[in-house]
A protein has these predicted regions:
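Helix-loop-helix junctions that connect adjacent transmembrane segments
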Residues: 217, 223-235, 272-321
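N-terminal alpha-helical transmembrane segments of multi-pass membrane transport
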Residues: 1-132, 271, 275
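Helix-loop-helix module between adjacent transmembrane segments
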Residues: 7-10, 14-17, 21-31, 64-67, ...
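Selective recognition of specific alpha-helical transmembrane segments in multi-pass small-molecule
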Residues: 21, 97-106, 196-205, 233-248, ...
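Extracellular/periplasmic helix-exit of transmembrane alpha-helices
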Residues: 110-124, 273-297, 356-388
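Membrane-water interface regions at transmembrane-helix termini and the short interhelical loops
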Residues: 2-8, 34-48, 68-88, 136-143, ...
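Conserved small/polar residues in nucleotide/adenosyl-binding loops
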Residues: 392-393
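Membrane-water interface at loop-to-transmembrane-helix junctions
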Residues: 190-194, 309-322, 339-348, 353
Length: 393
């Protein structure tokens, strides 16, 4: 192990070297053979959708049920840390960091686009169906709501428990301690951490790509900056630099403050759109759509369109389930790190309910406003969004 503790870093070569070798090899192959790589990834995705959709559905259902059961069982009273410990962060700071960790760029990118696409291009059939508004927003909330956060919650809970109650490292390998025992400190543990790093990198790449596309399109629209590979590279470098500075400043001085600023800005933007838009319609739609979402949660979560000839599932639900699962090691470690001192019940309710309620508000305010524009005759706006999601800036 390479010890750079004087600079705040400890590098485990058994994890770092295989991870960087695999990732660089993958990037190299994609750069050298972009068409073949794209075709291979497309074939793999199609095979997963055709043969493993049921597995994704079962896993997501089990995680959701397990989260609810644990939250309201006797183990909910266990504290993640010493029995007399208190939370490291205030409720607002904690929730702000949850929001920033799990849904930041994604909400900005999909808040308008996804409900519009589901409305104009529903899973089955063509055009905007009667009652399609409920279905469009409901599907969006399904992808960003309780199911997604149950993945993060359980991963973070396991890591927090073994780290703060058993004194194990705050890494994915610790989740396998009940199975592997002390072997987590050997090759098996290193392999698990390599897997976590690879999954995290793919998840971050997806989010970063969405943000870069959105910023690039926004700069082109507002200031006439030509969209190009150089522009996207510059945006990517800028985002990575800001992230690096935030991490270098530490959790309290960097990530915490940045998360709080993000939360204030997001809430301000949400309130602004709510007040200048069709406020009564948005609030009524929010209540109606949330009721529809909760009432149909089991049905929509397990609907794989098995008997329908549609490619919608692979492009949306299965894509999201895979995205959340790939993000889980990274987001889980971060959520565990900021949740020391909270009870399991408080932790699970906070991680699952608070972000989901914010998602419900966000998707209904922005998605509802966009669908109302389409009703008002702005069909070209809807078609533009459906054809190019990055137009939403």
């Amino acid at each position: 192990m390479l010890n750079l503790s004087d600079r705040g870093f400890v590098v485990d070569r058994a994890v770092f070297i295989p991870s960087i070798a695999f990732l660089l090899s993958t990037v190299g192959i994609v750069l050298l053979c972009p068409n073949a790589s794209g075709s291979a990834f497309g074939t793999l995705q199609a095979a997963i959708v055709e043969n493993a959709s049921w597995f994704y559905g079962i896993v997501m259902a089990i995680l959701l049920v397990a989260s609810v059961v644990l939250a309201f069982s006797r183990v909910g009273n266990i504290r993640l840390g010493p029995d007399n410990s208190s939370p490291d962060y205030s409720l607002f700071s904690w929730l702000s960091m949850l929001f920033a960790a799990g849904v930041g760029i994604g909400l900005m990118f999909y808040g308008v686009a996804e409900p519009v696409v589901h409305y104009l291009r529903p899973p089955v059939g063509e055009g905007a169906p009667v009652g399609g508004e409920n279905q469009a927003v409901n599907l969006t909330m399904l992808h960003w709501g309780f199911n997604a956060w149950s993945v993060y919650a359980l991963m973070a809970l396991v890591l927090a428990y073994f780290s703060f109650r058993r004194g194990l490292p705050l890494t994915l390998r610790s989740a396998f301690y009940p199975i592997l025992g002390d072997r987590i400190y050997g090759p098996w543990g290193a392999a698990i951490d390599v897997f976590a790093i690879v999954c995290t990198t793919f998840g971050i790449s997806t989010s970063l790509g969405l943000g870069v596309e959105q910023l690039s399109t926004g700069l082109n629209y507002l200031f006439g900056v030509p969209e190009s590979g150089a522009l996207k590279l510059a945006i990517t470098v800028a985002i990575m630099a800001m992230a690096a500075v935030s991490v270098a400043l530490g959790l309290d001085s960097g990530i915490k403050r940045l998360s709080e600023i993000n939360s204030f800005l997001a809430i301000a933007l949400l309130c602004f759109v709510l007040l200048i838009g069709p406020t009564a319609l948005i609030l009524g739609g929010t209540l109606e759509n949330f009721g529809y979402y909760v009432a149909n949660l089991i049905t929509t979560s397990t609907n794989l369109f098995t008997y329908e000839d549609t490619e919608w599932l692979g492009g949306w639900t299965i894509f999201y389930w895979g995205w959340w699962i790939s993000w889980a090691p990274f987001v889980g470690i971060f959520i565990a790190r900021i949740s020391r001192g909270r009870t399991i019940r408080e932790f699970l309710i906070g991680v699952m309910v608070a972000p989901t309620l914010f998602v419900v508000l966000w998707m209904n305010v922005f998605g509802g406003s966009a669908i109302d524009l389409i009703h008002a005759g702005e069909v070209s706006f809807g078609e533009a969004v459906a054809n190019d999601l990055s137009l939403i800036h």
